């Protein structure tokens, strides 16, 4: 029996992952008996200087692999991005397929391509990336490559990708719904069903969901996300209500108000392992 651990959206730079955080993660993986760790994208905004050194250190403790998220692509060429796509690893009879994925605006079909591009240019991180094709073309190309690969595989298949493969996981708040266009594509799910993919792990959208089965595919989405979004940050304000601010719904403002407090730093140290554990998916394979 092999225990494969999956995480995503560590955002090492934004979350200021230092020695304590790394040691806490290593200890957690030991406690959980993880034999292999796969990280499904968004390690940091600097693959060469932050993510790869982090992975090299962690690799001394545990075998691991990863696929890129959109933040990892910053500063990379199209060839460098493609070099990390469509890795296949075998664990007994089970294959783990990992790739980034992308989006084609199909989650928000009521808006035009021009409207989506304006929103992306004004608000979305990916405006900083230098992709060679437009978004629908990147997604179509990715789907074509994915299908070619899945056609060649037999036995149980686990897929890890970064982007969202099913509409059930989209934003439902009216303000954020326009950003669903940049989350993924339902076409990935259709391929997973067609080729009987057993389990799918993804991130990108910083919400944690209980695993659920949709048309025979079990989906897991438990990204770590930014510290301002963490459960321990939310719980801190419940345990220390004197630090609440008038605009508690503004996550960055409430986090900035307490991040340097001794009470918050101590609280984070006490509860970090539980936060990381909540962002860990474990799949056992024969």
Set out the residue ranges of the language-model regions.
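Active-site environment of divalent metal-dependent phosphoester hydrolases
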Residues: 11-16, 44-50, 71-77, 89, ...
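A short C-terminal boundary segment appended to hydrolase-like catalytic domains
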Residues: 243-286
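Active-site-proximal loop/helix segment associated with metal-binding centers of metalloenzymes
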Residues: 98-154, 163-175, 247, 253, ...
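N-terminal active-site segment of His-dependent metallophosphoesterases
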Residues: 1-59, 73-75, 124-130, 286
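Conserved beta-sheet core of the metallophosphoesterase superfamily
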Residues: 56-58, 65, 92-95, 166-251
């Amino acid at each position: 029996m092999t225990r494969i651990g999956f995480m995503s959206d560590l955002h090492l730079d934004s979350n200021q992952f230092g020695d304590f955080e790394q040691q806490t993660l290593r200890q957690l993986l030991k406690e959980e008996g993880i034999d292999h760790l796969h990280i499904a994208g968004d390690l940091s905004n600097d693959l060469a200087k932050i993510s790869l050194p982090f992975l090299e250190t962690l690799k001394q403790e545990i075998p691991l692999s990863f696929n890129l998220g959109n933040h990892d692509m910053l500063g990379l060429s199209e060839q460098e991005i493609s070099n990390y796509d469509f890795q296949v690893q075998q664990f007994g009879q089970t294959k783990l397929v990992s790739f980034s994925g992308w989006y084609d605006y199909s989650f928000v079909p009521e808006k035009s391509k021009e409207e989506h591009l304006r929103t992306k240019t004004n608000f979305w991180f990916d405006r900083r990336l230098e992709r060679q094709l437009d978004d629908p073309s990147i997604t179509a190309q990715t789907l074509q490559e994915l299908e070619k690969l899945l056609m060649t595989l037999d036995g149980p298949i686990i897929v890890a990708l970064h982007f969202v493969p099913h509409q059930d996981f989209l934003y439902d708040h009216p303000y954020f719904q326009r950003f669903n266009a940049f989350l993924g594509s339902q076409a990935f799910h259709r391929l997973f069903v067609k080729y009987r993919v057993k389990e799918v792990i993804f991130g990108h959208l910083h919400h944690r969901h209980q695993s659920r089965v949709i048309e025979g595919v079990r989906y897991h989405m438990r990204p770590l996300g930014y510290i301002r979004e963490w459960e321990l940050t939310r719980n801190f304000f419940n345990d220390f209500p004197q630090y609440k601010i008038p605009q508690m719904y503004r996550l960055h403002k409430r986090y900035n108000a307490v991040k340097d407090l001794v009470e918050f730093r101590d609280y984070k140290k006490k509860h970090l392992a539980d936060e990381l554990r909540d962002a860990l998916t474990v799949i056992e394979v024969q």
